[in-house]
Amino acid sequence: LEISKDFDELVYIRAVSKAGREGVISQIPVRVWKQKPELAKIQCDQEPIGGWYSKIPVFSYDLKEKEGPQVHLYAQLTDLKTKEILTGIDQIPRIRKDGRYQLDIYTKDESGNRSEQLYQTTCFVDTDNPEIFVRYQNPRSEILKYQKAQIIVKDENLKKGNMILRTSGKQVKPWKLEGDHYETEVIFLKDGKQTLSVQAEDLAGNKMIIQEKSFIIDTQKPRIKIQGIDNGRSYSKPVKIQ
């Protein structure tokens, strides 16, 4: 007996001997289902920025019931750094921490038919803001003769073009990657009020802005002016000097 199409009926079978004697009729339920299930509709609670998420994304699915054998959802979450794999049947594994992940999802019915389509996405998760440090050469003071500042920006997912430096000083070194951070230097030479602010944004859209307290550069020597006497002149009476 060959069944070449979807079938869900009882098949009656009876054996007959060569002598013509008929056996008892047996009822055998036969279910054949060859249609492949549709892929479930996958949803995420947020929109990524170029594949990057600033919050841990949560995925859900909508699987509509249709005629035929029951359909199940199969999901696999792979940590691309550690190669750790989490799997789920009728549930999507949750991302628990920052990192880079690949999510694969398909559906399969109880007859073994698997969906032709595969949902696959890569998630880059970074929930931390960049860190910015400013280190001064001279102790901080409201008035200084000279100052130099080293600026350090740390973030695993930072691009050189995503840092903005605004200052009244002079940037003497371009941004340069040094190990796990970017750094630059600013010097303050001109007299007057000095300002410094730094902004950094990572690939996930996390931002950090610092505005340093202003200070004054004063390179001028004190000037002394004496009034009430003339140079080289003698006086017979007391004089008042200012």
What is the meaning of each model-derived region?
Residues 1-242:
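Low-complexity, disordered linker/stalk regions enriched in Pro/Thr/Ser/Gly
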